[in-house]
Amino acid sequence: MQVATRFTQVSVLALGIAAAMASGQAQAAGFQLKENSVKAQGRAMAGAGSAQGDASVVVNNPAVMSTFARTTVQADVTAIDLSFEFRGSGTAAAGSPLQQPLSGGNGGQAGGLAAVPALSLVVPLQDRFEYLTLGAMVSAPFGLATHYDHDWVGRYHGVESDLVFVDLTLAASVELSDRFSVGFGAIYEHAEATLSNAIDFGTGICANPQTTSLCFLPNPVQGPYGPQRNDGFATINGTSNSLGWLVGMNWRPSDRLSLGYTYRSEIDHEIRGSADFTVPANVTPIFASTGQFVDTGGGADLTTPSTHSLSATWQASDRFALMAEATLTGWDSLEEVRIQYENPRQPDTAEDYLWEDSWFYSVGGEYRFSDSFTFRAGVARDDSPVSRPFRSSRLPDQDRMWYALGLTWSASERLDISANYVRIQMADTPEVDIRSTSGSRLVGEYDGGADLYGISAQYRF
């Protein structure tokens, strides 16, 4: 029997690659990760693109590498403890005669604990190349991980969402004068995506005029088909490799003031992989003639956003420094994601996101208590790119506030050990009212926040 194409498109729609970029371990707005420097995190990222002595400038502003006098290697690890829980209810076949409450719980703790590592190297050259400094860094600029219970009330909107971007950045800086340097870098980015959700085949069958009669045999209560009675499952996996670039400038108008600007390019990805469908045995014959909902290859194109960052560090005294940072992230690159399948009978699916550009602002400071210990703190506001009409169970995003503390122990002339704690919380309670065109509606709100614990070691040769 021919099942409506509209149901086919909508059922798989929730599996869009962009939907996987929704919420979770991402601890900056959208699916951005800023956890590339324990020192900078201790100031809520203030001064990340202008402060000296932090090898993560390879990606935060490669021009600052010119201020390094020694070859430096740095390893950072941040543990993200995300608390993320839904409160609300849902309706299957909303607005139709078959309407009924969605079964299932709140999905459990959708967050969890995840580690974000970073490794950086800065190498100042000597002799005739003394104005040139090289750098390399492995980092994760974007990512998320959320896992709901398989039978939760919002299972038709999303169950598992994993997205990982890993960058290898090779950079160089040139000192044009004692006060001014420029830097540039090439980015090789690897992306992996896994996402899944349940499919309410029962509602689709009952909503299609050609198969509605199956829902009333022998009656609407005991019939073989109906909303929530014939759930299937779908999982999409994909990978991609692509290239990007960044440039930076660092102006030091005095010995106490450092100003930085950094631009990171968009990176275009063609994520390709597989779409795997689990279809109930009593549903399979209905779709047999259509050739749909069978395992196939597929993928989607998406673009990670560009960023513009302004940074300032002012050494107010020999012991005290103030920092500030402002970053504009070009989330308007995420307007629509269209999934194309290798199976010619599986129609493309598309979803509008229409994200908006967003700002991140932070201020912070450092106090050098002694030759051995430096303390730091900072606060930040991270605006969400997601407006309420586009907020979903995969992205119940909201403006966020950062509250950060950190310290560095200079164990020797060559070795620094740093640690931080950051509390990230929503500026307001994110509410969702999601109506899927396949029939289900999810209404509720999210309680969420995150605790970040970071540790790093820096060694100067």
Sequence positions of predicted segments:
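Outer-membrane beta-barrel porins/channels
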Residues: Q27-A40, A44, V116-F461
